[in-house]
Amino acid sequence: CHTISNWKTTAGLFHIVSEKAVVRNLTIDASCSMKCTDNGEEEFYAGFIADVNHGTLEGCINRGQISHRSGKSLMSNYVGGICGMNKYIVINCDNYGNVSSSGNFGGNLDNRSAGIYLGGVVGGSPTRPLSCAFIGYCDNHGTITYSGAFPNNYIGGIAGSHTYVKVKFCTNRGNVTVAAKSISESDVPQGLQVGGI
């Protein structure tokens, strides 16, 4: 096992974990913290172990706090305790750190595809079929908090969104708190999905 301590960061340890790569038995301890803000013009990914995972994350633990803010974003944001975007396997990974996100959508009201994807373990997954993508035997113990105004809001204890991903034997033990706002006085959030898993 390897432990990282006293680390203050604005991005994950690995920006991208590539195909066939394995990150195993790595712990981010409670002395670590992440504060991150998207650049507004591109999709944004953040997770303590990996921002984007194409490989395997196994036996990893996060105890650090993540604080994300969207600065008038035009695109979607994916934030998770272990990884922001998962495209392959996350197994036996636990999150104990609090994960929070706030901020507002900065695009035209006609652009309804942008969203916040916030989860204790994984932020989200691609919205197209992935035959092997899997989240299994993972637990979240941290508090997940979201406050903001986006067309779409997906918040979960394990994953904000896991479309086309198999999720098995996962448990959420943390609180999930959401205060989604309308993006204009005459509008309401188009999509609001909140769950323990």
Task: Locate the predicted segments by residue.
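Surface-exposed loop/turn motifs in large extracellular/passenger domains
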Residues: 1, 6-197
